[in-house]
């Protein structure tokens, strides 16, 4: 697995007369089993960059490669990319919507066209890995604590078996103990799943202890 960004630019409002250059000439390579910290102040373009990496935004200029393929090539499957490059947005608990925890986690892998057996197995395993017990599978995700909701949201992305997991400010709004628990969880996922992780934060202290390199 590798993601390569070559001379990537992104501008908002192109052609409106109010164009804003969010990213300029970004060159980046992410290899197998890397833990990368993406650190910067608010408005520095961190969220824009990770949406480009997941295919939610299209670069104004430049090229992005995933496993050697140009993601903007007509033959490339963006659906496949979004399964392999998992993106957990900031405050992901606000995006929970299903009637039960297990149904919420199963939603993503079902949309990838997997068999019911695969969907159920991967969803149960993902929930187990983030510390959500079987006693919570059938309850409404809205009845969970804030920390549990966030874990369920992360499980929903993990259930799609991503090779690259990107998290946008996953410690936002958590108290010190919650922040440490989240970082410990991410470190565990990194080792057990042998995936690459991009951890977005404005706080250097959050990432310095765990990241292999910081951007």
Feature-to-residue mapping (PLM):
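The feature captures the beta-strand-to-loop junction immediately N-terminal to the Walker
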Residues: 39-41
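Helix-to-loop junction immediately C-terminal to a conserved catalytic motif
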Residues: 54
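Conserved ABC transporter NBD signature motif
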Residues: 62-73, 81
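Conserved ABC ATPase "signature" region
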Residues: 117-135
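Conserved ABC ATPase signature
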Residues: 140-144, 148
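Conserved catalytic motifs of ABC-family nucleotide-binding domains
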Residues: 161
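Catalytic Walker B motif of ABC-type/P-loop ATPase nucleotide-binding domains
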Residues: 165-168
């Amino acid at each position: 697995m590798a993601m390569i960004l070559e001379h990537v630019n992104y501008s908002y409002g192109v052609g409106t007369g109010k164009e804003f250059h969010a990213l300029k000439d970004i060159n980046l390579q992410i290899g197998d089993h890397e833990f990368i910290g993406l650190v910067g102040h608010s408005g520095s373009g961190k969220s824009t960059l990770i949406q480009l990496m997941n295919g939610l935004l299209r670069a104004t200029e430049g090229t992005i490669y995933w496993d050697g393929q140009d993601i903007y090539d007509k033959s490339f499957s963006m659906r496949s990319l979004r399964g392999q490059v998992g993106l957990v947005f900031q405050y992901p608990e606000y995006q929970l919507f299903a009637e039960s925890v297990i149904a919420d986690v199963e939603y993503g892998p079902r949309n990838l066209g997997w068999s019911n057996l695969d969907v159920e197995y991967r969803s149960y395993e993902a929930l187990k890995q983030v510390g959500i017990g079987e006693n919570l599978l059938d309850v409404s995700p809205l009845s969970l604590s804030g920390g549990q909701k966030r874990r369920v949201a992360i499980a929903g992305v993990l259930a799609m078996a991503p090779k690259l997991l990107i998290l946008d400010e996953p410690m936002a709004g958590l108290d010190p103990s919650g922040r440490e628990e989240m970082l410990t969880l991410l470190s565990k996922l990194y080792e057990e799943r042998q995936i690459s992780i991009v951890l977005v934060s404005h706080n250097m202290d959050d990432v310095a202890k765990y990241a292999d390199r910081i951007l």
